[in-house]
Amino acid sequence: MEETVPSKTEPGFAKAIVTTRAALILTADSGSVSIPWERCSERLAHATREERERAELSPSGYGIHWPLIDEDLAVGPLVRSGRLVS
C-alpha cells in the first residue's frame, strides 16, 4: 500500500510516497528518488507499516515527520542518499 504526502510549499519536492520497502520522494521536475527504510533511519527500518504510513510533510516542505515513532528527517539529505528512479 502507498501513502502520498503532498508538498505545499517546497518547490523542489512535490510529494513523498510511502511504500513497504522505501520512501519515494517525487521532485517538482518529475524526477523521483527511492530511499530504502534502512537508509532513512533505524527507527524507520524497524517501524510497522502503519507507523510509516502516518508520514506528514512539514509545513515548510523541508522535512517529513512520523508522529507515531517521533521521527523527523530533512528531505534534502534523504534525496541525496537515495537512488534516482527513472
Segments from the language model and where they lie:
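Motif-centric detector for short Cys/His coordination patterns
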Residues: 1-86
